[in-house]
Amino acid sequence: KLIPLGQSAGQNILFTLAERIPEVVAQSAIWPLDDIGSFTPAQIIASSRHETQYTRLFRS
């Protein structure tokens, strides 16, 4: 939602990151609950602007 991205580019990114998913899942299973969280106001604002963007997520 943060950047205008075509469907093919989005699929390429997902394919590239797919091999890291098991590693990230394993790491997340051992993180203490106190360390899990986020404070990302810029991401929230950018996501809210997504709705009115000319180019939207996976626009064909």
Curated annotation (Swiss-Prot):
GO cellular component, one term: cytoplasm
Domain of life of the native organism: Bacteria
Main location: cytoplasm
Keywords: Chaperone, Cytoplasm, Nickel insertion, Plasmid
Induction cue: The probable operon is induced by urea.
Entry's localization field: Cytoplasm
Subunit structure, interactors included: UreD, UreF and UreG form a complex that acts as a GTP-hydrolysis-dependent molecular chaperone, activating the urease apoprotein by helping to assemble the nickel containing metallocenter of UreC. The UreE protein probably delivers the nickel.
Role this protein plays: Required for maturation of urease via the functional incorporation of the urease nickel metallocenter.
Family: Belongs to the UreF family.
Name of the protein: Urease accessory protein UreF
